[in-house]
Amino acid sequence: MPWTAPSKRSILRIKINGHKRTGRRSIVNIASFLSPKEEVTFLRDDMTIRQGLEKLKRYGYTAVPVIDAEDRYVGVVSEGDFLWNILSHNSELDTITMKSLEKLSVRDIIQSGKIRPVCIDTNMEELLGQAQMQNFVPVIDDRNVFIGIITRSEIIKYFIKKQIEVAEKQI
């Protein structure tokens, strides 16, 4: 039997049956999905454009979180942000040199607010809303300190596992 996506009704059932309840709402601790900062590729906002590009290339990501010297979340930068910034500062493509990539920092190309972080105590509904729009969701604490990311794939794996558990109980 081929796998089909869970319906909204079965997701609600999973959430209610799979977690402790308070009143009418189920609580999911989103920390269980967290990839901690120590395991996440990120850039510092004071890195040069060249350093940022090298790190993106080395790890093969198309977008990564950016933090400042105090580990506070600043935003996300993508390969597209790098490309558009390089092109806007170099009118001729053949004038792009490594030296020109040393003049600007990552903080100069960040589009703040493009990807909003969630707080570690955020509810599952808000996390799901953010994860629908991007491959990862940055997670911060109550002081805006970056503590890691939650990937959309981890959330999907969780719901698939819960859907299978529900299906097995019905057999």
Q: What does each of the following model-derived ranges do?
A:
Residues 27-40, 101-114:
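Bateman (tandem CBS) regulatory domains
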Residues 78, 83-102:
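Helix-adjacent hinge/juxtasegments
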Residues 33, 85-86, 158-159:
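Residues that scaffold the ATP/ADP-binding catalytic core of kinase and kinase-like folds
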Residues 101, 112-120, 140-171:
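Cytosolic regulatory modules rich in charged/polar residues
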Residues 11-15, 24:
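Short, positively charged and aromatic/hydrophobic N-terminal segments
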Residues 42-60, 66-67, 116-134, 140-141, ...:
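The conserved cystathionine-beta-synthase
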Residues 56-59, 64-81, 131, 139-154:
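A glycine-centered beta-loop-beta connector
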